């Protein structure tokens, strides 16, 4: 069993795209045993606790993840015992079937080379993702030569993440209903030049890699759009987040909260509102936001009209406004996307609205940390999804 989770804090500077190398991003833990023979590695736990702002929360979440893995192991063993399954044989069958379906789906795509370029807001310059797909028989090779070089910012995407979100884009287009396992991805390869934003050289920072990595499915869809009819959708947006740390009522806090944007429309339906693609994160509940940090939610509502026009409109983004009431200042940082380059419409559909972040009515650069004082108000508007097809008269 395995689990991936966001922790409230891992040390270093608080999470933002503004950090310039991995050493600012907190703990780097090589493969070590947290438990051995059922016993917690107290030395490792002490090291983690000493280097994070909220050790009870961070270690509590880690142990919660461990408990989840243990429960999955128990239930899997029960299933295998009760049903008399051979796990290895079952895995081979499932992976083999998934591989066959994916290879057949790729074979149905005409052999050839397909290209699409997507652009991100960037910092001093726009970030370019140049996606070239070569289809030959039952294989698909995706190359990102021509993409932006790695940056001294926390948006670099490590190769495993590049592959994961590229392969995901292929899967949702060609074989969305097949079980998600290694077999689905054996016919797919990805390459990116070393030193590029999709294959950075250590110690490049990558804590905000999602805002670039989550654009890769759109790059894949854009490249294959000419041969896939109306199976692709208009662009949406990765989610945004804000992280806050400080001290209130005698205790230290560190929290991370997520906000979704609008989903792009398709040839069959309007985009869902406040549902980022391809994110698998929900919006943080208001009750959690207010209970973990000294903030008061002034409003949280659908950002009406932010989706792009079209035969089918893009989904609307989110409008969130909160007020900070802590007696002591707090440091707040943001990870945000689609503030300059909007989610593109498709087949004549309109672009979605860009997102913005403002403090006391003044738009800010989300890459810069903000110091909040009592009474400060922050408003975050996430982007709307692109529309699909020309609007009907």
Question: Which residue ranges define each predicted feature?
Answer:
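Glycine/proline-enriched, intrinsically flexible loops and inter-domain linkers
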Residues: 1-393
């Amino acid at each position: 069993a395995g689990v991936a989770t966001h922790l409230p804090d891992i040390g270093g500077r608080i999470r933002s795209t503004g950090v310039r190398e991995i050493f600012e991003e907190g703990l780097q833990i090589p493969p070590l045993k947290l438990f051995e023979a059922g016993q917690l590695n107290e030395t490792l736990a002490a090291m983690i606790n000493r280097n994070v702002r909220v050790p009870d929360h961070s270690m509590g979440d880690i142990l919660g993840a461990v408990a989840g893995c243990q429960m999955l192991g128990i239930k899997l063993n029960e299933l295998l015992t009760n049903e008399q399954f051979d796990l290895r044989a079952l895995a081979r069958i499932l992976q083999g079937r998934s591989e066959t379906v994916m290879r057949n789906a790729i074979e149905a795509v005409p052999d050839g080379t397909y290209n699409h370029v997507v652009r991100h807001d960037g910092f001093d310059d726009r970030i370019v993702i140049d996606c070239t797909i070569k289809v030959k028989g039952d294989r698909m090779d995706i190359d990102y030569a021509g993409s932006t070089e790695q940056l001294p910012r926390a948006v670099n995407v490590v190769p495993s993440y590049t592959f994961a979100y590229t392969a995901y884009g292929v899967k949702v287009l060609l074989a969305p209903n097949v079980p998600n396992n290694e077999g689905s991805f054996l016919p797919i390869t990805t390459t990116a030049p070393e030193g590029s934003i999709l294959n950075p050289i250590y110690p490049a920072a990558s804590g905000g890699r999602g805002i670039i990595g989550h654009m890769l499915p759109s790059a894949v869809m854009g490249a294959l759009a000419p041969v896939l009819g109306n199976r692709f959708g208009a662009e949406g947006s990765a989610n945004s987040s804000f992280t806050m740390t400080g001290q209130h009522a005698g205790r230290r806090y560190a929290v991370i909260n997520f906000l979704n944007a609008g989903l792009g429309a398709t040839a069959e339906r309007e985009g869902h509102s406040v549902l980022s693609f391809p994110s698998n994160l929900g919006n943080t509940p208001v009750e959690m936001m207010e209970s973990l940090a000294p903030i008061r939610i002034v409003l949280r509502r659908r950002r009406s009209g932010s989706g792009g026009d079209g035969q089918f409109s893009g989904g609307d983004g989110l409008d969130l406004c909160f007020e900070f009431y802590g007696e002591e200042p707090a440091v707040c940082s943001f990870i945000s996307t689609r503030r300059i380059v909007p989610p593109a419409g498709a087949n004549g559909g309109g672009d979605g609205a860009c997102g913005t972040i403002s403090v006391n009515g003044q738009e800010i650069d989300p890459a810069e940390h903000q110091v909040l004082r009592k009474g400060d108000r922050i408003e975050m508007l996430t982007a709307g999804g692109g529309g699909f097809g020309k609007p009907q008269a």
